[in-house]
Swiss-Prot record:
Keywords: Activator, Nucleus, Transcription, Transcription regulation. Transmembrane segments: none annotated. This is Mediator of RNA polymerase II transcription subunit 3. Pfam families: Med3. Residues 134-156 have a biased composition (Polar residues). Its main location: nucleus. GO terms for biological process: regulation of transcription by RNA polymerase II.
Amino acid sequence: MAVGPPDQIFKDNLTFDTFRELIIEKESTADEVADKVLEAKKALLPIRTLMTEFVGMIANLESMGNKTSQEKFLAIRMKLIELQNNIQKFSKDFQQLQPVMRTMDKFNEEVNAGEKKFFVQETLGYTQLASNGSAAGITKTSSGNDGNTTGSTANTMAMAKGLKKNAAGKPNTGTGVQSGPGRRNSTKKTGHTGPATAPTTSNSAASAAAAAANTPSLKQIPNTQPMQLMPGVSPMAMASPLNNISPQRKLTQHVNQSRENSLHQGVTPSASMITPQNILNMSAFDLNQNQTPQSLDNVNNMDLTNLDLDSLNMEFLN
């Protein structure tokens, strides 16, 4: 079985001289090679379309409410199989064209082709050009944004100037009507300092600042009441409520002092002399009186012979 020219071209280790002889020998060989290249090129568009449809089907899977789970599975399976078949066919055609591509690369490297040098018909260079165009568009946009930023900065400066004018001119409003020359001078100064038509943003900002200035502010009333220091209590102990709890030893000393003072005076502190320290002393003194142990003399005077033990319930001892 004789091997045709296309089969001789699409095989490994094909030299450029052999490739040129086969094309010159039969003109239809060049057409067959061109058809193979176009067939592989045309297979790309269906693959892209099927890929887009497959992704859209997966994304809208939940919206397919009129189909059962089995129908959804079969639809996705058929679309995936179709996509796989197209990819395999394109891979096979592209793999068949590899010898021709390698041969043309060797021709560019080894042979001094000059004007006959082989160039790829379509490369990724257009992507770089598009990227450069996008970058130029982005640069123009950023330049426009810079202009807008400059304009906004100018508006901000105008607003600040308007606020300063309002703040400076407000104290003079309550001083009365000025004389004629003074009014003319102020009018002239106002005409020189700003444009006749102020921006709307500046007017709104100035009115807002004037309204805020007219609003009465709440003044903080300082605490003029002096702090009353209790005797025997340091200022550090008054910082926290827990610090007011003194140890048992100090409490005993205060109780003893209060008892001595009350015994010497014979009266309790009056209502006009009530202080936190006196309250603590009185409560401690009352507690001490209630918990005062009985004297041992009272125990010695008890008559144990007259105790009646008949009423005691002794059944629990049995």
